[in-house]
Design a protein with these regions (language model features):
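Buried hydrophobic packing segments
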Residues: 90, 94, 114-118, 298-308, ...
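Residue-level signal for inorganic ion chemistry
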Residues: 134, 155, 188, 297, ...
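ATP-dependent carboxylate-amine ligase
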Residues: 3, 9-43, 48-50, 233, ...
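Residues at the starts of beta-strands that form the adenosine-phosphate
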Residues: 100, 150-151, 185-186, 204, ...
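Adenine nucleotide phosphate-binding catalytic loops in nucleotide-utilizing enzymes
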Residues: 209-347
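Short glycine-/acidic-enriched loop or helix-start segments at secondary-structure transitions
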Residues: 86-87, 141-143, 163-164, 197-200, ...
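Gly/Ser/Thr-rich loops at beta-strand to alpha-helix junctions
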Residues: 81-83, 108-109, 193-194, 294, ...
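Phosphate-binding loop of NTP-binding sites
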Residues: 4, 8-228
Length: 473
């Protein structure tokens, strides 16, 4: 009879479902074993790590993240600038409150790198486990195919690597679509950024931002991206601007305005080139890095901490943890020269770094290293939108232009007003390091694109100035 055949089909489906699940379980366990073994081999014989273990595990089981992340409360940090430091600060704070907080500090913020991060985790049964993951904007949607975060933290979106991301609204669509795959997850985003309030999302949202100045009618600089009202396309006005297009914005034509803030920075009590003190939601905090952009990173991390009910004293301790992050104002001593290494990758970030450097109370020399590999962004036209002209006003005694595109960097600095007698071009990093030793000042700022940072750190490690040259963190 037809219903007997139907029952047979149903029974076969159950059998294949169970058997298939068993096979998938075996595949996952085998993938994990291969990944962990390759990690051990890399650390034992090559003294370092990479995303290779994750790549191998994914080749065996494309759904391996399902198995690895299922016991974690996952927090995802994404955006153009500030991901790395915001992730580090968030991890530092949560570790004051929770026993097990996993993160990806080695620059592996794409899918295979995330898998490698989970492969490194030690078993912690019976404890509340967090994973705070920095994820590349273009990779978010791929990662959320397999991981279901409970919280997304959006830092900002600025023009960056146009050959990879396109314009800012394309990038925003990328991360909104990635977050939508976990529709119940909360998005905590920068309320001072108009783009984060430009479209409705399926996810619930909260906002952090600055509320530290009296209202004063202002307009963003004419070359600023993202200042058109998303509703009527008139130019936004501001009652307060922190930098670029961030601030207390509103549209005089249609009434579009900054949303109510859930987490508020109400005062900056001190800020220089190496530190900042401020008040968030009535509590005083400080960080051991300078610049307005880093205060935003601290505010974002504090917002996540408040969401998880971390007490203010533990937030304070986590923010004050003085361990410099890869390329984020890390200080490296080279034969008596105190070199501050800063990653730069787009005009907004560069301008914030220039503003921060301008706060230095002591004389310094400058090194600018420019590469144009895929991870840097092949299009280097962005250097012409950066305010290098400010360097000409700082009376810097010596400047080095280096990296694979040293000639382009030198041209930009000359056009900005750096005198030729103060400027030296040096392509090879071994020569750059030798030239740094001869600079006339004790303090040196090194501004470098991503792969230039990696190459410089590798060479510094080879010469014994640092450990773990190619790794971040």
């Amino acid at each position: 009879m037809w219903y007997d055949k139907l029952n047979l089909l149903e029974n076969l489906y159950v059998i294949f479902d169970v058997f298939g699940g068993y096979i998938m379980g075996i595949r996952s366990q085998f993938a994990i074993a291969v990944g962990k073994t390759s990690q051990w081999a890399l650390k034992t014989f090559f003294k370092g790590g990479s995303s290779l273990p994750g790549k191998l595990a994914l080749r065996i089981d494309p759904h391996i993240l399902d198995s690895l992340a299922k016991d974690y409360q996952v927090v995802v940090v994404t955006g153009t600038n500030g991901k790395t430091l915001t992730t580090a600060l968030t991890v530092n704070i949560l570790r004051q409150q929770f026993d097990e907080v996993l993160t990806n500090p080695t620059g592996a913020n794409m899918v295979q790198g995330i898998v490698s991060t989970f492969l490194q985790a030690k078993p912690a049964k019976g404890k509340k486990k967090f994973a705070v993951l920095e994820i590349d904007e273009a990779s978010l949607s791929k990662v959320t195919e397999y991981i279901k975060p409970e919280l997304f933290l959006f830092t900002n979106i600025f023009r960056d690597q146009m050959d990879r991301y396109g314009e800012i609204y394309t990038t925003y669509r990328m991360i909104v679509e990635g977050a939508a795959k976990s529709p119940d997850a909360l998005i905590i985003s920068n309320g001072d950024s108009p783009i984060f309030n430009s479209v409705e999302t399926v996810n619930p949202r909260k906002y952090y931002g600055f509320d530290h100045q009296e209202d004063e009618e202002q307009m963003a600089h004419y070359n600023t991206d993202g200042v058109l009202c998303p509703n009527c396309h008139h130019i936004l006005h501001y009652k307060m601007i922190t930098y670029a297009n961030l601030g207390k914005y509103y549209c005089p034509n249609c009434g579009f305005h900054r949303p109510e803030l859930d987490y508020r920075l109400t005062e900056i009590t001190h800020m220089d080139n190496v530190s900042a003190d401020f008040v968030i939601d009535g509590n005083e905090y400080g960080i051991e890095v300078g610049g307005m952009y880093n205060v935003y990173n601290a505010l974002a991390a504090a917002a996540v901490a408040e969401h998880y009910n971390v007490p203010a004293e533990k937030i304070r301790k986590g923010l004050g943890y003085d361990e410099k992050v890869f390329g984020r104002q890390e200080v490296i001593e080279i034969d008596g020269k105190k070199c501050t290494l800063v990653l730069v990758k787009n005009p907004v970030g560069l301008n914030q770094v220039i503003d921060m450097i301008g706060l230095a109370p002591y004389p310094f020399s400058l090194v600018c290293l420019l590469n144009a590999n895929y991870a840097d962004g092949i299009d280097i036209s962005w250097i012409w939108d950066g305010n290098h002209e400010a360097f000409a006003e700082m009376n810097i005694p010596a400047v080095i232009a280096g990296g694979e595109r040293h000639a382009d960097m030198a041209t930009r600095l000359k056009v900005a007003g750096i005198p030729e007698e103060k400027l030296k071009e040096t392509k090879e990093l071994t020569e750059v390091i030798e030239d740094i030793k001869k600079l006339p000042t004790e303090h040196v700022y090194i501004l470098a694109t991503y792969t230039a940072v990696l190459q410089l750190r590798k060479e510094l490690a080879n010469q014994g100035y640092i450990k773990g040259g190619m790794d971040r963190g």
